[in-house]
């Protein structure tokens, strides 16, 4: 029993040291001419920290990502008219399903990109912490 406790204590020390030694790495991604899905997958990988050698699923990577020119990204196919973003208020008749065009008019390209990236993050307590490290400019 004591051996396993010592192992866990050592692992915790290593985690803390890794986090202290990591410098915040900043990425700037220009979205001009790139497709929505390609940008989203690249950013999701960076935000999770999967491209670093010290990747741990339970630790938020010390990274910041800035996406510029979001309004100049390419949206291929007929997604503008056919893609729908659903949200439900919880009340009868409270299901809203605006198309991509309607969301862009109301909230901008930032919302589209953020939703795509959010869908690629794990659905747990780390998701909001990871998404805080993302900045999108139109």
Indicate residue ranges for each PLM-predicted region.
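Ribosome large-subunit tunnel/peptidyl-transferase-proximal elements
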Residues: 14-115, 121-125, 135-138
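Basic, nucleic-acid-interacting segments
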Residues: 128
């Amino acid at each position: 029993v004591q051996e396993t406790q010592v192992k866990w204590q050592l692992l915790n020390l290593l985690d803390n040291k890794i986090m202290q030694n990591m410098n915040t790495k900043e990425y700037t991604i220009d979205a001009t001419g790139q497709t929505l899905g390609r940008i989203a997958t690249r950013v999701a990988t960076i935000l999770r920290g999967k491209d670093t050698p010290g990747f741990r699923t339970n630790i938020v990577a010390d990274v910041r990502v800035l996406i510029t020119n979001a309004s100049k990204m390419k949206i291929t196919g007929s997604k503008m008219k056919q893609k729908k973003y659903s949200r439900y208020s919880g009340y009868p008749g409270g299901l809203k399903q605006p198309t991509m065009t309607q969301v862009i008019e109301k909230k901008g390209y930032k919302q589209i990109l953020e939703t795509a990236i959010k869908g690629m993050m794990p659905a747990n307590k780390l998701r909001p912490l990871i998404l805080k490290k993302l900045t999108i400019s139109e």
